[in-house]
Amino acid sequence: MPRRRVVATREILPDPKFGSQTVAKFINHVMSHGKKSTAERIVYGALETVSQKRNIEDPVSFFEDVLENVRPMVEVKARRVGGATYQVPMEVRPSRRTALAMRWLAEAAAKRSEKSMALRLAGELNDAADGKGNAMKKRDEVHRMADANKAFSHYRF
């Protein structure tokens, strides 16, 4: 984090199939070891599976709705005051909300037990759309932590 000037955010090129920057960013989250074509195959396969299962014409809008479900509104940050560390609830900035939601979806999908990663991701997207699944559980856990520590909100930065 530089002290002098604000670093410009990098523009991400939209994905080739849907032309969506959101999907392109999610592909980058799913990608491991630089294997982008494999990550694209996984994400496109998952969106295809979900759109067939739910009879959806526009999988991108469905994906954005799922992301909206998983996005956290508040989180806790550790703040040291007078020798004690408090978990202070803070509002999450929009770019971090999206990044956290994508990270949680990818991690939750990787932990599932379906056969292929595309099927795991499809299952997790389906569950998140219904308000279930590990990604939603993670979001609720973060919200619960923030709610439990509401008493320390006056220690905001």
From Swiss-Prot:
- Stored PROSITE patterns: RIBOSOMAL_S7 (PS00052)
GO CC entries: small ribosomal subunit
Offer one example of a GO biological process linked to this entry: translation
Pfam families documented for this protein: Ribosomal_S7
Which keywords appear in this protein's UniProt record, sorted alphabetically? Answer: Ribonucleoprotein, Ribosomal protein, RNA-binding, rRNA-binding, tRNA-binding
Question: What molecular function terms (GO) are annotated for this protein?
Answer: rRNA binding; structural constituent of ribosome; tRNA binding
* Family matches, as Gene3D superfamilies: Ribosomal protein S7 domain (1.10.455.10)
Top-level taxon: Bacteria
Q: Per its UniProt record, what InterPro entries does this chain match?
A: Ribosomal_uS7, Ribosomal_uS7_bac/org-type, Ribosomal_uS7_CS, Ribosomal_uS7_dom, Ribosomal_uS7_dom_sf
Cross-referenced SUPFAM superfamilies: Ribosomal protein S7
Its annotated function is as follows: One of the primary rRNA binding proteins, it binds directly to 16S rRNA where it nucleates assembly of the head domain of the 30S subunit. Is located at the subunit interface close to the decoding center, probably blocks exit of the E-site tRNA.
Give the family per the record: Belongs to the universal ribosomal protein uS7 family.
The subunit structure is: Part of the 30S ribosomal subunit. Contacts proteins S9 and S11.
> Any idea what this protein is called?
Small ribosomal subunit protein uS7
At the highest ranks, the source species' classification is: Bacteria, Pseudomonadati, Pseudomonadota, Gammaproteobacteria, Moraxellales
Q: Which gene encodes it?
A: rpsG
